[in-house]
Regions:
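The substrate-binding groove and active-site-proximal loops of carbohydrate-active enzymes
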Residues: 29-39, 105-112, 147-149
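Short amphipathic alpha-helices and their capping/turn segments at secondary-structure boundaries
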Residues: 1-6, 48, 73-84, 124-129
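Short acidic, glycine/proline-rich loop/turn micro-motifs
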Residues: 19-21, 100-104
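Short, hinge-like loop/turn segments at secondary-structure boundaries
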Residues: 24-26, 76-78, 106-108, 192-194
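Active-site-proximal loop/short-helix segments
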Residues: 5-33
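Substrate-binding cleft of secreted/luminal carbohydrate-active enzymes
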Residues: 3, 85-99, 109-197
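Extracytoplasmic/secreted envelope proteins and their assembly/folding machinery
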Residues: 41-44, 48, 78, 82-85, ...
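Aromatic-lined carbohydrate-recognition surfaces of secreted/lumenal glycan-active proteins
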Residues: 7, 14, 35-75, 116, ...
Length: 197
């Protein structure tokens, strides 16, 4: 019994610190003077090497934004992470995207298939191809209501997210995110979770 995987959640530097860094009120450089993305990659390389000696898989959770072509302000850069861990898990929750992001004119959370498919096809798949040995992509999906009382996330929205990812070529699995971890709510999605995509 037990688990054969260690998942590093929020493997990043603090966000919203740009002004402090710019004004030299905070310095995140380590003793090796590595940039943030380098420091994260070095840590994950070390952790992966050590945990592999014990027969343990290593996964890392990253923001959906990290699949873009730039290094994020908090140091996450998809190619640097996918190159050193066994599993990478982006968090592209549809309610985290702005209304005009990716050219959509209606709120992204109302179009879970389109947003997940676009993100997967146009960003993740391209970043995965930039390295020789990319990790398996197992994406976090949104299992909570984006705006309580306004829009409900049920089986249809869960299915659309999973299908959008699969149609983009991301077939390494998914994990539903619901901060309350309410098992009764998860049961409502069992049809979506058990469907073949």
């Amino acid at each position: 019994m037990g688990f054969n995987e260690i998942q590093f959640d929020y493997v990043r530097f603090p966000d919203r610190t740009y002004t402090l860094e710019y004004n030299k009120k905070i310095d995140f450089k380590n003793t090796y003077s590595e940039e943030k993305a380098q420091a994260i990659q070095t840590f994950l390389m070390y952790a992966t090497d050590e945990l592999h000696k014990l027969g343990v898989y290593v996964s890392a959770d990253v923001f959906g934004e990290s699949a873009h072509t730039y290094v994020t302000a908090y140091g996450q850069y998809w190619p640097a992470i996918t190159n050193v861990v066994d599993v990478i898990s982006g968090m592209p929750y549809p309610d985290h995207f702005s209304n005009n992001e990716y050219g959509f004119t209606t709120p992204p959370y109302k179009q879970p298939y389109k947003i997940m498919n676009y993100w997967g096809e146009n960003y993740v798949m391209k970043r995965q191809q930039e390295v020789d040995t990319p990790a398996v992509v197992r994406t976090w999906i949104q299992a909570y209501n984006p705006i309580p009382g306004d829009f409900y996330y049920g089986n249809k929205q869960i299915e659309e997210q999973i299908k959008g990812l699969n149609d983009a070529g991301l077939t390494g699995g998914f994990m539903p995110w619901l901060s309350s971890s309410n098992l009764d709510r998860y049961k409502l999605f069992k049809d979506a979770f058990s469907k073949e995509y």
